[in-house]
Amino acid sequence: YQINGFVKNGKLNFLNQLNVNNLKLNFNIGKNKYSLAEVNTEINEVQFSSPLIEISEKKDLFFVKGKILTSEEDLSRDQLRLIFASFLKIPNIKKVKFKSENDISFNVSKKLKFKDLNINSKISLDQLVLKNNFINLKSYLPNLDELINFEKHQIIINYAKDKINIEGNGEILIEKKSDFINYQITKNNDKFTF
């Protein structure tokens, strides 16, 4: 069997935390395979799109694979927390503006248990403003501003199981002057490497 169709102006609510609005997509359903194409939606007021999301069913698991795109967005701390809460601890963010391209895959059980999450992201960070209350650098940088600004960063993030690798570069404004930085941060379980 095969079923083709589309959804226009769909709405979903997941556990009163994720509100999906203006959902538009084309779907194709076959035996143990589902395809969602030309997906456009708004999740907690943030625009997302995907050219293709493929879902295949094997025994008691669904394997989900796709590309998720975000257009350039100004996000609040609360929006970030709602979208990324299960993956990231959000520091004291004052402002963030970025766009991203994300390849994702994961398994989900019929009881909605997620595992084997893999994310490969390319992020163009236009601006990130953090309140510096998480690390004391005053002894090293006496003129340190309360706010740290990151601008024009190109970032690649790879996440798999308990390992995350972040590589990037861009401008940082710490002491009233801008510097260009390159960085690589790896977190394996609870161990960080810089």
Describe each PLM feature range.
Residues 1-194:
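Membrane-proximal interfacial segments on either side of biological membranes
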